Amino acid sequence: MNAYYEQDADLKYLQGKNIAVLGFGSQGHAHALNLKESGLNVCVGLRPDSSSCEKARENGLEVNTIADAVAWADIVMVLLPDQYQKSIYESEIKPNLKEGNTLAFAHGFNIHYNQIVPPGTVNVIMIAPKSPGHLVRRTYTQGNGVPCLIAVHQDYTGEARQQALAWAKGLGGTKAGVIETTFKNETETDLFGEQAVLCGGSAELIKAGFETLVEAGYPEELAYFECMHELKLIVDLYYEGGLSRMNYSVSDTAEYGGMTRGPRVITSDVKAEMKKILEEVQDGRFAKEFIDECNAGYPNMKKLRESNADHPIEKVGAKLRDMMSWLLKK
């Protein structure tokens, strides 16, 4: 995959245009502020009763309702939660889109699964920073940026790709590198990674390890330290230099034990189940399940949240984290 940098992008494709950023959460505040400080004309679209209205104004941004922001804008970036985008699109975005506008997203879920079907007379693009919003913002203020993905779903004006690259440049992304992909590939890999590894697989691995030690008679505190707390040390090594950096940094005992026992935990059966999870993402079964869950008021999700909150690892973890002065208390 090719990477694009500063010389490959030109802010002229956004200059002189009205840009609306819908939402002012983690990504929304970073996009709006970075683009504004890149010299672009930005407003934020929010519900009138949103607690973020005051925050956005305190940061020197103009705030409008979502409908008014879209009506004013040439380019609209939708940075709202996936489950709310369809209804807001139908009621406030779609009626105010104009021919030649650009509709932008930071995640492809609603476009890829046809929850949102824009008219053929607009550009549809994606700019997805591969970092949380606070890091997008911080690196920009330091004169750097984070890697970004871009994609073009629909190019009505002939400038969709240039606009996506320009947006990434306005975020600071072209200083790190920008990779072009598709809505399909971004959506499916993102969902799979969340479910099988990052949020689902890792959480279940942690709980299973904790339970194994506790059921064998070891103190919960030791089980927490070994299966939850110390995971950050290992993940940071992965993050900084991959698997080889981790293996180089740990003891020979840990390296040998990990290489010989790890495959007994993540077996061919586990990988087969991962493939099934990927198939559910690819064929839309997961998307339908999630949308149905949202429409029903999250009955299953509420039960799962309660179950996780009641797990013993959460109780002992809260107690041990109170001993850690370096952690921010919330």
Curated annotation (Swiss-Prot):
Listed SUPFAM superfamilies: 6-phosphogluconate dehydrogenase C-terminal domain-like, NAD(P)-binding Rossmann-fold domains
Pathway given in the UniProt record: Amino-acid biosynthesis; L-isoleucine biosynthesis; L-isoleucine from 2-oxobutanoate: step 2/4; Amino-acid biosynthesis; L-valine biosynthesis; L-valine from pyruvate: step 2/4
CC cofactor: Mg(2+)
Designated name of the protein: Ketol-acid reductoisomerase (NADP(+))
Catalytic residues identified in the record: 107
Gene: ilvC
Pfam families registered for this protein in UniProt: KARI_C (PF01450), KARI_N (PF07991)
Cofactor note: Binds 2 magnesium ions per subunit.
Residues forming coiled coils: none
Catalytic class of the enzyme: oxidoreductase
Native source species: Chlorobium phaeobacteroides (strain BS1)
Binding site residues for substrate: 251
Positions contributing to NADP(+) binding: 24-27, 47, 50, 52, 82-85, 133
Keyword terms: Amino-acid biosynthesis, Branched-chain amino acid biosynthesis, Magnesium, Metal-binding, NADP, Oxidoreductase
Binding site for Mg(2+) 1: 190, 194
PANTHER family per record: KETOL-ACID REDUCTOISOMERASE, MITOCHONDRIAL
GO cellular component: cytosol
InterPro entries hit by this protein: 6-PGluconate_DH-like_C_sf (IPR008927), KARI (IPR013023), KARI_C (IPR000506), KARI_N (IPR013116), KARI_prok (IPR014359), NAD(P)-bd_dom_sf (IPR036291)
GO molecular function: ketol-acid reductoisomerase activity; magnesium ion binding; NADP binding
